[in-house]
Amino acid sequence: MAKDGFDLVIGLGVTGRSVIRYLTDQGMPVRAIDTRAEPVGLDALCADFPDLKVHTGGFKKGWMGKARRLIVSPGVAVSTPAIAEQVVDGKEVIGDIELFARAASEPLVAITGSNAKSTVTTLLGQVADACGMNPGIGGNLGVPALELLDDQARLYVLELSSFQLETTYSLSAEVATVLNVSQDHLDRYASFADYLAAKQRVYDGCQVAVWNRDDLATRPPATVARQISFGAHPEADYRLDSENGQLLCRGEPLLSLSELALTGHHNAMNILSVLAISDALSLNRDKALATVKTFTGLPHRCQLVAESGGVRWFNDSKATNVGATLAALTGIGESIEGKVILVAGGLGKGQDFSPLAEPARQYLRAALLMGEDRTTVAQGMSAAPCELVADMAVAVRRAHALAQPGDAVLLSPACASFDQYSGFAARGDDFTTRAQELCHD
């Protein structure tokens, strides 16, 4: 073992703590670093691992140099100078998903994309469970991947972020998918091309690639021998036939849209991707169809949270990028008789908001924009009727005043939440509480 022979875990969030637990169980010497002076949960971690050496408040150069390898949490960029220096020196720098891939013995489905990852991961997990696979479901969603290894799973279903894929080298999934790609995390990546390259790593070594024929950025490399596509495109293997209201597999009807609990184009795409993956895994199709029919979605994802006076209120707080808001605005705008009042804004992450301009013109009664980058969002939406508001309380009251019977009020921020909230869930809960209070008055 090289040098002092310890693994250095960088970042003490949920992922970092799972890595420490895993390596300690393997009998590996471990040390840990967090650039925060007082990481949340540090006292509990030290109580659980009293022999663990921890440095906080920055990088400890001596440890960085002596460690045999670095295990970097997703929230820490490999391009950070202190880490990049170790890469240049030839040190192994990996993440928790790489450790998982080296240890897992059962088939893996790897799911990434700018949007819908959690929905597709959850629904596929439900399908696999209905088929008796006892799936291990997690990764970027819920349970850290390494904590799934002891669950006697016959199949792993992992949601993976671009950050996790950056430090993963031997994934070799049974089925891998990039659901969609739109601008996101441009505050971390030098360019959209770099972000796309990180997403495309999910296909490395996979047996089957499932991709979105409506989004060519998701297309896998030609080196993947077996490729299955989904989408509204006429040549998609699993296709949405909007004209006849059906989902098809190579021209044969699977089910009617009227049979689904979920509505909207984006939800049809999610269900098609799940059915494509399920078939690629040779899961029971009848059980898969029965499961997708009754799926009602996840919290904070186009979730109907209130209804009063002919106005419906939707919480889509998980929409932290333009692509997600575009899908929600189009899906809801197409499905209602009235107009949409959009509540958006927050931390823009360097995105281009101009793709929202056309659907905003078509579907919006008004956009109520809050948060640090609200002016930037308004500029991107150009001619759309925009109002700048101070916070969620003002936005909800104003939406209530503007809404007419047949309208929908949609919280779909297209931005991160950390300028005003602890996360997207707190933002969505704030919207939901205020909407329900108004509707019950």
From Swiss-Prot:
Sample GO molecular function, one term: ATP binding
PANTHER family per UniProt: UDP-N-ACETYLMURAMOYLALANINE--D-GLUTAMATE LIGASE
Similarity-based family: Belongs to the MurCDEF family.
Localization annotation: Cytoplasm
Record function comment: Cell wall formation. Catalyzes the addition of glutamate to the nucleotide precursor UDP-N-acetylmuramoyl-L-alanine (UMA).
UniProt binding sites for ATP: 113-119
Enzyme Commission number(s) from the entry: 6.3.2.9
Pathway: Cell wall biogenesis; peptidoglycan biosynthesis
Name of the top EC class for this enzyme: ligase
Top-rank lineage group of the source organism: Bacteria
Keywords, alphabetical: ATP-binding, Cell cycle, Cell division, Cell shape, Cell wall biogenesis/degradation, Cytoplasm, Ligase, Nucleotide-binding, Peptidoglycan synthesis
Reactions this protein catalyses: UDP-N-acetyl-alpha-D-muramoyl-L-alanine + D-glutamate + ATP = UDP-N-acetyl-alpha-D-muramoyl-L-alanyl-D-glutamate + ADP + phosphate + H(+)
Pfam families referenced in this protein's UniProt entry, alphabetically: Mur_ligase_C, Mur_ligase_M, MurD-like_N
Biological process per Gene Ontology, one example term: peptidoglycan biosynthetic process
Protein name as annotated: UDP-N-acetylmuramoylalanine--D-glutamate ligase
Provenance organism: Alcanivorax borkumensis (strain ATCC 700651 / DSM 11573 / NCIMB 13689 / SK2)
Record GO cellular component, one term: cytoplasm
